[in-house]
Amino acid sequence: MTIMRKSHPLMKMVNHAFIDLPAPSNISSWWNFGSLLGLCLIIQIASGLFLAMHYSSDTTLAFSSVAHICRDVNYGWLIRYIHANGASLFFICLYLHIGRGIYYGSYMYKETWNIGIALLFLTMATAFMGYVLPWGQMSFWGATVITNLLSAIPYVGTSLVEWIWGGFSVDKATLTRFFAFHFILPFIIAATAMVHLLFLHETGSNNPLGIPSNSDKIPFHPYYTFKDLLGMIIILAMFLTFVLFFPDLLGDPDNYSPANPLNTPPHIKPEWYFLFAYAILRSIPNKLGGVIALVLSILVLALFPFLHTANQRSMMFRPISQLLFWTLVSDLMILTWIGGQPVEPPFIIIGQIASILYFSIILIFLPIAGLIENKILKW
């Protein structure tokens, strides 16, 4: 008689994905972020569900309902701060996961990589709409500024913006639909993540050496189940420490003022995890050009499989590419800093140089470095 996990239709799927899955024997802790992203998604859906029970998506009630959650609902303050900071944790794990993929050449699994990019877009859309819901000053003006960018699209832009707003400005209709979309999108993300996993399991995981590991596989359980569990415990400990001691560190003080269409905040800026893209947007003095650069700053990830010129998949033994990779990481940190600064010298020129460097490293320097490293290996 076969054991249940191998015969039961449902258990069989779980077994193939999480128990008997053959995994490379040498994958490092950088491979933990997939499971950590799953944990983040579960935390966000669970905390979001409880927040939605008490939240009201009406312009006159939204701000008060969030205050009510924090003051009157049992542990409402905790649920709210877990949800708000959970988004930051989500993006930290997401960016580290993408960085790992770039460093170790995981983008060569094209289907998995492209679905990952779709997941990134979905997550960014969800986070943006979630930021609008508390209906504070930065919520309102962030929504106004970012949705207004679509008006730069020739011919259909203005109509498109008014269609998204449901009127001639960000108002009740906008808030209601953003709440509806913010509620449904995480479930779409969860479904897309399943497809992401499906394609990953077609090829098997990459490994730090970037070489086929078919000759040396180990079962996912117990080795990587416990490794993932350890990662989850460490991340949860750090996350809860942050939530309980510094809940407002990453938030904007302006969002504690109710939305006021007649009063513009001095510096309109998104949450920290969008600042790098916001800096790229602002570094181009033309509206349409800025919007195109903003979209391309994420879409450029899709070009990685086609720009890979090196004979080796991983950057582990490619020092020139390593140097460029860490320059790219530093450049993204500079862009994040610039995105939070006012539009004045010297920040404007720093942002423009950092934006040019961002695209240059990905589109020009990394492919050239790969070719140089191929030549060096032949000597």
From Swiss-Prot:
Residue ranges of the TM segments: 33-53, 77-98, 113-133, 178-198, 226-246, 288-308, 320-340, 347-367
Residues reported in the UniProt entry to bind a ubiquinone: 201
GO CC entries: mitochondrial inner membrane; respiratory chain complex III
Family: Belongs to the cytochrome b family.
Requisite cofactors: heme b
One record GO biological process: mitochondrial electron transport, ubiquinol to cytochrome c
Protein name: Cytochrome b
Binding site for heme b b562: 83, 182
Chief location category: mitochondrion
Cofactor note: Binds 2 heme b groups non-covalently.
Note: Heme 1 (or BL or b562) is low-potential and absorbs at about 562 nm, and heme 2 (or BH or b566) is high-potential and absorbs at about 566 nm.
Subcellular location: Mitochondrion inner membrane
Keywords: Electron transport, Heme, Iron, Membrane, Metal-binding, Mitochondrion, Mitochondrion inner membrane, Respiratory chain, Transmembrane, Transmembrane helix, Transport, Ubiquinone
Role, per record: Component of the ubiquinol-cytochrome c reductase complex (complex III or cytochrome b-c1 complex) that is part of the mitochondrial respiratory chain. The b-c1 complex mediates electron transfer from ubiquinol to cytochrome c. Contributes to the generation of a proton gradient across the mitochondrial membrane that is then used for ATP synthesis.
UniProt: heme b b566 binding residues: 97, 196
Quaternary structure note: The cytochrome bc1 complex contains 11 subunits: 3 respiratory subunits (MT-CYB, CYC1 and UQCRFS1), 2 core proteins (UQCRC1 and UQCRC2) and 6 low-molecular weight proteins (UQCRH/QCR6, UQCRB/QCR7, UQCRQ/QCR8, UQCR10/QCR9, UQCR11/QCR10 and a cleavage product of UQCRFS1). This cytochrome bc1 complex then forms a dimer.
Coiled coil: none
Membrane topology designation: Multi-pass membrane protein
GO molecular function: metal ion binding; ubiquinol-cytochrome-c reductase activity
